[in-house]
Structures are given as C-alpha cells and as structure tokens.
C-alpha cells in the first residue's frame, strides 16, 4: 500500500487494560479506574431517566445538524446557532481542525506536555510541530509560544486547564495572549475541564466575537458524565464553523448522544454538586502533599491531580494497580516520577492517599 509518508513512525492509540482483565491478572475482586478522568459521580439523574425510558430508532440516521441540541446549547451560552459545531467528542473536532488548516508546508504551536492528540493529528497531516516546554510549575509558556509563531503557523493550541498538569490560565492572561497572536492564526482554547474550575471563571464565550481567530472547544465527556456518548462541540465565529462543516461527516453525533447531552446541560444543579465534590477531592490531595516534603502536587484545576513522588512512575503505577486502583503513569506523559490520578469519590481518594503514604 502507498501509505501517507507522514504516518511513518507514528503509532496508534493503545487503550489501557479493561478492568476485568486487570482483575483477572492480579486476582482482584474489585478495581477502581482513576486513569481516564471520567466523572466518579456518573451523570445527571435526568440523563439516567432518559436512558431508562428512551427508545431510539436505530435504523434512522441521526439529525446531522444536531438541531435540538444546538438550540439548547446556543440558549445556554447566549450564542447564535451558527456559532456552534458538534462532533464525536473533542477528538473529532481536533481532527477536523488539523485537516482544514495543516499540511506539509504549515506548522503548529503547542505546549509540551499537553493533550497528545494535538500533536498526533498535526503529524498525520505532515505539519511541523513546534512544542514549547511548560514552565517549572507546569504552566504554559505563553511568551515562548508567541515567539514560536511565524508566517507558516496556522494553529496554536492552549489546553486550559492543561492536561496532564491541571494548570489554569486566567481570562485576563488569555485575552492578553489573544491580543498578540496574528489574526490569521487560529487559537484553539481547549476547555474540556473548564466546568471543574473553582470558583468558576466568568462567562467568556463572547470572546469569539472579539477574536475572530478563536475557537473554544468543550465536551460532554467530563463533568457531564457522557464519555461513551461521544459529544463534543466548538464555539467560534461563523466563518470558522463553515469551513469545519465542509469536512465534518454528515451524521457524526448519534441520536441518543444528542438527547442525553440535552438533558445533561439542563441539570446544572448536578454539575455544581460534581464541581463541589471534585474541589473537596483536590483538597484531600493537597493536604496529603503538604505533609511530605518530597511530594510535588501540580496546581489542580481539572478533575485529576498530577503528583510527583520522586519515585519511578512505573513503580507507583504498578503498586496502585496491585492494590486495586488504575491510574495513569507519568512516564507516558512526560513526568517520569509522577502519576496522574482522577479525582474519585471521597473514600476512593482517601484509600489512594493511604496507599501513597505507605509507599513513601
């Protein structure tokens, strides 16, 4: 086969082991998955009720425009419906963005470490990837990113809060950054974890009307608890949305996914409860980290913590796994002596912390 040259050296995504597989291997009767930043509280009771009572005509294609969901989300954020695009998770939106803006003559700027799919999709398109190391505290080096932009740059990625460090860039700094980015360079502000930030930042969706080169990406996979439904969306100027729709598959979000997302966004009381529970979980880890001088906890603003114990990441990962907790080894994330742990329920956090204390 005459494969694209840009695929040379790239590897496919390797999912972690299934919980059942890990239990069988280690002889465990229970395992808790804290590796994929899923919502430990599940999803809204309204979503659960819809799931229990919904019947979907599986032989009928879904609404390719996601009309009902589009109206609800537009009303929620006070946007025009044409300022939205819906995709099969933010993963698909990242793919569409790289497809319309990157090729072998272009480059893209991002932090490192950050969400790996920016880099992967850029390389698939054959583009040059310019990675700017995070600052010592895990924050984006925004000045360094600005300096990396040239005439061939078409996309700049800002993951906020950043995955895997959890650092959050406040709105004033985002605006100052946007003021300096050339108007023909798209800034992707990936806010997959924005609903977890405490206290919540002021509404800023209106920025797309000031900065015509901005797209804000969000998802129903995290705090809304719909990871398997695969519904993400982008907020941007209509001209950007029009270009993305050219390459968007016509029926890319499912009927049930659209319906579940509508119920999910309506239940903001559940979202507030999730945000409070998550903030309390972060405090548990902060209290733990303060007791041990060798422990470094990166600023946590998502639903996970990146914690450096000064111990080889694989050792930490295997130790927690053998004790019934699947986490994410920092070795694959650019942090060789750290692990990323999803914030769980209070008792789950306490159990993991107790195990880490024993390891230290």
UniProtKB/Swiss-Prot annotation:
Q: Which residues carry this modification: N6-(pyridoxal phosphate)lysine?
A: 222
The terms under GO molecular function for this entry are: histidinol-phosphate transaminase activity; pyridoxal phosphate binding
Instruction: Enumerate the CDD domains for this protein.
Output: AAT_like (cd00609)
Gene3D superfamilies recorded for this chain?
A: Aspartate Aminotransferase, domain 1, Type I PLP-dependent aspartate aminotransferase-like (Major domain)
Q: Which reaction does it catalyse?
A: L-histidinol phosphate + 2-oxoglutarate = 3-(imidazol-4-yl)-2-oxopropyl phosphate + L-glutamate
Q: Which family does it belong to?
A: Belongs to the class-II pyridoxal-phosphate-dependent aminotransferase family. Histidinol-phosphate aminotransferase subfamily.
Q: Can you name this protein?
A: Histidinol-phosphate aminotransferase
Extract the PANTHER family matched here. Answer: HISTIDINOL-PHOSPHATE AMINOTRANSFERASE, HISTIDINOL-PHOSPHATE AMINOTRANSFERASE 2
Keywords assigned by UniProt, alphabetized: Amino-acid biosynthesis, Aminotransferase, Histidine biosynthesis, Pyridoxal phosphate, Transferase
How is this protein organized at the quaternary level?
Homodimer.
Q: Give the pathway.
A: Amino-acid biosynthesis; L-histidine biosynthesis; L-histidine from 5-phospho-alpha-D-ribose 1-diphosphate: step 7/9
What the entry lists under InterPro entries is as follows: Aminotransferase_I/II_large (IPR004839), HisP_aminotrans (IPR005861), HistidinolP_aminotransfase (IPR050106), PyrdxlP-dep_Trfase (IPR015424), PyrdxlP-dep_Trfase_major (IPR015421), PyrdxlP-dep_Trfase_small (IPR015422)
Gene encoding it?
hisC
- The UniProt record lists the EC number as 2.6.1.9
The biological process GO terms on file are: L-histidine biosynthetic process
Q: What is the lineage of its organism?
A: Bacteria, Bacillati, Bacillota, Bacilli, Bacillales
- What Pfam families does the database record attribute to this sequence? Aminotran_1_2 (PF00155)
- Which cofactors? pyridoxal 5'-phosphate
